Amino acid sequence: MKSPASVIAIALLAASAAFAQTAPTIGQGPGYHDPRSPFKPLEERSDIVSWKLLSQVTAKAEKKKIVPTFPAAVQALDRKTVKVQGFMMPLEAGDKQQHFLLSSVPTTCSFCVPAGPEGLVEVRTRKPVRYTLEPVVVEGQLAVLNDDPYGLYYRVEDGNAVN
């Protein structure tokens, strides 16, 4: 007969293995939107660049820094006008923002795993956008960043909030 401690250890090991299969490592990948989240996950739309596409980037270490390698489909979007959607991460205080990040997962969800740089887009808009916990769609010129000093992979410039 197994001791209660060994049964608990086996149960904890099985639970941690199950969790490891469903959630990525924090700060890597497109993030994980847990089904327990009070926020609906982003819907795939044909008129919006997919996070599945943007997250196909790989990274490698070169000379003490991480360098992204983008697939051809992502590189083809560089300097093109696109729509992206995500959850706002304000970079400054205030109800309205002109410089913020969009995340593939809600940043206020305690059940969700944050994304790495492939799950974030830096956004600069012409007109201020009201902060919201709901998903935001922005249209603007996408820059695919090969050597950003902040480690970002994507930036939308000259953007506008759209539906």
Regions found by a protein language model. Give the residues of each.
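Repetitive helical segments and hydrophobic/amphipathic motifs
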Residues: 11-12
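Bacterial N-terminal signal peptides that target proteins for export
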Residues: 1-8
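OB-fold and OB-like single-stranded nucleic-acid-recognition modules
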Residues: 20-163
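N-terminal signal peptide c-region/cleavage motif recognized by signal peptidases
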Residues: 15-18
